[in-house]
Amino acid sequence: EVIYYVDETAKAIADPEVKKAFLNDILSESDLNSQGIREAIFDYLYAMPEKEMVAKIIAGVRKEDIKEFEAKSLSDLVTDDYPFYMDPMPNLYFTRDPGACIGNGLNLHHMSTPARRRELLQYMYNYNKDFAPEGSQLWYDYNGPHSIEGGDVLVLNKETVAIGLSQRTTASGIEYFASNVLKNSTFKRVIVFRIPEKRAFMHLDTVFTMVDYDKFTIHPEIEGPLQLFEVTMGADGQLNYKSVTDELSHLLAKVLNVPAVDL
């Protein structure tokens, strides 16, 4: 089933008070330095039906959209050629990054760069029960301080999650996620792939992808320098960490319980 951000967010903010809170949160995350402009944008957007408002937030609010507003500061009077008051949301081109569905729960990711931290998923999780039914777990909270992005998260089976330690996903973020998911789900281990921190290898899914239950594509440049770690939950409720010395193909075959895998 394909679902659409605009539709599901609009459902989540159907209540007028939730709509106000959502809009205030989005404006607070949009780096608006002028109270006068902020108030004008709030009034402009709040007057729209929910679906239209969400679509406009995603597309960005241009200066030409706000015809008049009351100047309340020097910054209100200073003009430049930049076309937007509120920038478009680049995350919506890469929808696997802001969140991930993992077992019976969801990650709402704290993105690595500020431009990508204006999110819609938090409201969908909190207020849209078609999207996140009662009992859905939250493994990773968007408000956490450590970055994880969804391109680094790969569910291998009901017991194993792979995650990239990369340019955009931190070790601290992985620890926070692993602590939650291993305590409260069927997952028994998190396999950490440390990949080179450069833009060409930005996420795990740019260099390693599962295409069948026992088949994977892998970028040849990461096979040599690849470091692997396994994170499990101890009987005392504390995380255990170990370096993996097995070859990747052997490790994958073992955790997937298959005779062999094709890379």
PLM features: what roles do these ranges have?
Residues 1-263:
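The feature marks the mature, well-folded catalytic cores of soluble enzymes
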